[in-house]
Design a protein with these regions (language model features):
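N-terminal beta-strand motif that seeds the catalytic metal site of vicinal oxygen chelate
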Residues: 1-20, 76, 128-166, 201-204, ...
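Core segments of cupin and vicinal oxygen chelate
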Residues: 2-4, 13-53, 57-60, 105, ...
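Vicinal oxygen chelate
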Residues: 8-16, 64-91, 94-149, 151-160, 178-182, 222-272, ...
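Short acidic, gly/pro-rich beta-turn/loop elements at beta-sheet edges
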Residues: 24, 54, 66, 86-88, ...
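Short amphipathic alpha-helices in soluble, non-transmembrane regions
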Residues: 25-29, 89-94, 171, 217-223
Length: 272
């Protein structure tokens, strides 16, 4: 998890078509460890139990469909601590790399998920050092299982209105947004569709500090015409961003499992 002040980024949740195909991809190509499968969910972590988290939810074609036009998710950037693990991933499954880069610490690569999502895997402190290379000179490590840790470092979202999209997250987190979110202006029929209809990014889940006042945040959002839901225990605040991506925020004392693929949350109410 990535933390900034009062907030931690817990996990993204992606709706997918074929769960097993995606499990194979995240395990073999990205080196994630499958932590558990529960109903339609598959939950991934790292191989040293450092609290890395990444979640997918299977939605079959009779309930969901492919995105028409650009997806809400443009790019996912994932950082690992050990540059050698990037080499081991490339040695194990290099045909999945659509582009290979060389940086100050080592290699990086871009790959495409089964749902046609662009993912960059790297171990750099400065992405500007990455230069495209034709191939990676790597050797396979026989006992390599997967990455020892990973962080969802940044997301790029395709949005209808970049100013409104940025305002939502600025208003919600201020300067404490615990990951980088970039916005690309795009046009398409599914950029604001309900998250249960397409195979796309569905949820961005956050945790708040133990002493953080979710009630005050809920009241602030309501005054600013953003509809949100606060549960009776005052430990879960749920709302959606301008792209209808669900953004649940939970307190640490709330011990219930915190994945919401089947629960409806209020849609955003744009400011006038």
């Amino acid at each position: 998890m990535t933390q900034s002040g009062n907030f931690k980024f817990h996990t993204p949740i992606f709706r997918v078509n074929n769960r097993q195909e995606n499990i194979d991809f995240y395990q073999n190509t990205l080196g994630f460890k499958l932590l558990t499968e529960e109903n339609a969910l598959a939950v991934f972590t790292d191989w040293t139990d450092r609290n890395s988290l990444f979640v997918i939810e299977e939605s079959p074609a009779y309930r969901c469909r492919a995105v028409e036009g650009p997806k809400k998710i443009n790019k996912v950037v994932i950082k690992v601590s050990d540059p050698l693990e990037i080499e081991y991933l490339l040695a194990r499954d290099d045909h999945q790399a659509k582009a290979i880069f060389q940086g100050e610490k080592g290699y990086a690569f871009e790959t495409i998920s089964p749902e046609n999502g662009l993912i960059l895997m790297h171990a750099e402190d400065d992405l500007s050092t990455l230069k495209t290379v034709e191939y990676a000179d790597v050797e396979e490590k026989e006992d390599f299982k997967g990455v020892s840790d990973f962080t969802v470092e940044s997301l790029t979202l395709n949005v209808v209105d970049t100013a409104q999209a940025a305002f939502f997250y600025d208003n919600l987190f201020g300067e404490e947004l615990p990951l980088s979110i970039h916005f690309e202006k795009a046009e398409g029929p599914d950029l604001q569709v309900s998250p249960d209809q397409t195979w796309d990014l569905e949820i961005l889940e956050f945790k708040v500090a133990e002493d953080y006042d979710l009630v005050a945040l809920h009241e602030k959002l309501e005054k600013e015409q953003f509809s949100s839901y606060l549960d009776t225990k005052e430990s879960l605040l749920a709302l959606t961003d301008m792209s209808n991506i669900e953004v649940p925020m939970t307190a640490p004392q709330d011990s219930r499992k915190r994945y919401f693929p089947e629960r409806s949350v209020p849609e955003h109410t744009p400011l006038h």
